[in-house]
């Protein structure tokens, strides 16, 4: 009986470990860039690979909406993938009059009325949260982690608060020496020796810009909190 009980216990533990994590992978059209979404029992993380080599691993990814952390205890309900090959012509062309958009995209659906769209390009990756909530959405916070070694060189535009005109000069500092209490605007450049990582964002509408600050494992995102009220400040501003 003890042998059967022990065997049953081991089988149960094995089943729990198998269900504890699922990984969804999206790869660039040339097969060199890879983003892996790790669906744990209680959280989401992501890994980045280039040419088979790990660039960033076990990076935190999450979001809290309307007081609920939708990425806690994530339950995947399905996924779909597609290849995107199109030419984008900006209404107001700046550097290019035509931009080639070539990537592989995977949309991962979750039980808490949200999806995560992952894209892998030949020169980078991108992601986006998409909700299926009918009511008005208020984002409490978004979690983005960048786990980098302490000897990476950072090229950052430093600021001590969220009120910035984005005119500060860029400074160059090692990640392990970047002091706490200081943030960086985007874009920021990380020299990871094996490759260089440019972190940026796009398509912001009614959403605050991200900043990045020092964390115990590298860098973490910080966002301006939603103001509870506005009042005039000087002759042409609100605060």
Q: What would you call each of these model-derived segments?
A:
Residues 18-20:
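Boundary at the C-terminal end of the N-terminal hydrophobic targeting segment
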Residues 5-14:
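Sec-dependent N-terminal signal peptides
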Residues 25-239:
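N-terminal accessory beta-strand-rich subdomains and adjacent acidic, glycine-rich linkers
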Residues 4-5, 23:
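N-terminal cationic leader/targeting segments used for protein routing and processing
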């Amino acid at each position: 009986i003890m042998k059967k009980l022990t065997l049953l216990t081991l089988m149960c533990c094995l089943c729990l470990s198998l269900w504890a994590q699922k990984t969804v992978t999206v790869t660039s059209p040339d097969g060199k860039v890879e983003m892996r979404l790790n669906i744990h029992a209680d959280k989401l993380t992501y890994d980045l690979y280039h040419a088979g080599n790990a660039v960033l691993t076990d990076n935190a990814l999450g979001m809290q909406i309307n007081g609920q952390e939708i990425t806690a205890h994530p339950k995947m309900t399905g996924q779909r993938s597609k290849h995107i090959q199109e030419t984008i012509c900006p209404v107001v062309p700046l550097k290019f009059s035509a931009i080639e958009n070539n990537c592989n995209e995977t949309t991962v659906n979750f039980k808490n009325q949200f999806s995560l769209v992952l894209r892998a390009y030949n020169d980078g990756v991108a992601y986006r949260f998409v909700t299926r909530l009918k009511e008005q959405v208020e984002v409490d916070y978004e979690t983005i982690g960048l786990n980098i070694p302490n000897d990476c060189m950072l090229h950052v535009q430093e600021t001590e608060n969220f009120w910035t005109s984005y005119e500060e000069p860029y400074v160059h500092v090692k990640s392990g020496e970047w002091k706490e209490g200081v943030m960086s605007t985007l874009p920021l450049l990380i020299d990871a020796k094996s490759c260089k990582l440019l972190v940026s964002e796009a398509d912001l509408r009614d959403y605050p810009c991200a900043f990045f600050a020092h964390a115990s494992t590298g860098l973490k995102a910080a966002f301006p909190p939603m103001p509870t009220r506005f009042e005039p400040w000087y002759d042409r501003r609100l605060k």
